[in-house]
Amino acid sequence: MQQRNTPVEGTAARRNASVAVAAGTVLGLVALSGGTAHAATPTDHGRPVAQIIGGTEKPDGSYPFMAALLIKGKGKPLDRHFCGGSLLSPDVVMTAAHCVDDVKPKQIETVVGRTVLSSKKQGHLRNIRTITIHPRYNGDYDVAFLELDKPVYGIAPVNLPTPGTDALIRPGSKATVAGWGNTDTEVPTHPDRLRAVNVPIVSHIECKATYSNYNKKVHVCAGVEGKDSCQGDSGGPLFRTLKGRKGVYQIGVVSYGDGCAAQGAPGVYTYTGSAQLWDTLWKSAEGKRVKRLLNR
C-alpha cells in the first residue's frame, strides 16, 4: 500500500519521498547531471503515497486555494514538488502530517494559487515559519499546519465542515480531489499542470473491510477503480461545493491507499469534519497556537 506519501504499516502514503534526501541527493544529482529527478518525501510510517488517476487538466485559475509544497533549492518546481496542501487562512496551509514529519521549516516552501508548477508568474510563494503536526499523529490524525512567513491575500481559503457532522460524507456522494501527483499506475508520470478528478465517497464499512487500521472517527474513504489520488497528491484536499452556499468545503486531506485507483481499494483521507480530530488538537499546546492563527 502507498502513501499518497506513506503512514501505517501495510499501506502507502501519497507523497513523493524524503525532503532530506531530496534536498541533498536528488537536487544535487539534477544540478550535476542536468537530468530530472522527482522530489522525494519524509518518513511515512509504512503506508503508501498518492497522485491523481483518471482526472483531467484544469485551466489557469482553477482551485486557487490549492498549495504545492516544494523542497527549497535551484531545481525546477516540478522536480522539487513533493506534496499538496490547501489554504486554510491567509497565514496557514493545511497538509498531511506524513508530508512534513521530521522536516524543518527552512527546508521547504509553498506556493498557493498556482495552476502550472513551472509558471513562476502564477500564485504566491511563501516561506514556512513553523510546522505544527497533530499531537496524536501516528499514521492516524494525519494532518499538519504550516504557518506562512507572510499572509496570502486575494485568495479565498477553503471552508471546513462543522465538527461532528457526517452530512458531507454520505456514501455515494461526489467529491473532488486535486493535485500534481502521479497520473499513471504503471509508469510514474508527474504533471506540471494541476489535475482533478471526481470520486464517490465510500462507506466506513467498506473501507474497514479493506484497511484494518481504518479509523472511522478520523478517516473518510473515496475513490473507485480508475479514479483516485496517488503518489505526490498527499496533503492535498478532498473537497466539494454545496448548493446554496458559497465557497468550497474541504472534507478530507489525502493520506494513503493500497496502490492507486485499484479495484476495491479506495483512497483514505483524514476527515476534516471529525470532532475528535479538532478537539484533540485544540487541547495541545501546539494546537492552541494553530487555533489562534485560524481565529477559532
Enumerate the language-model features and the residues they cover.
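Secretory targeting and sorting signals
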Residues: 1-40
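C-terminal region of N-terminal signal peptides and the immediate post-cleavage residues
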Residues: 30-51, 292-296
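C-terminal subregion of chymotrypsin/trypsin-like serine protease catalytic domains
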Residues: 40-42, 87-93, 97, 108-109, ...
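N-terminal activation segment of mature serine protease catalytic domains
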Residues: 45-74
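A conserved glycine-rich beta-strand in the N-terminal activation segment of trypsin-fold
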Residues: 64-66, 72-90, 139
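Conserved H-D interstitial segment of serine endopeptidase catalytic domains
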Residues: 69-72, 93-96, 101-136, 206
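Acidic glycine-/aspartate-rich tracts in secreted/extracellular proteins
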Residues: 72-74, 98-102, 113-118, 149-154, ...
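Chymotrypsin/trypsin-fold serine protease catalytic domain
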Residues: 125-127, 140-225, 274-280
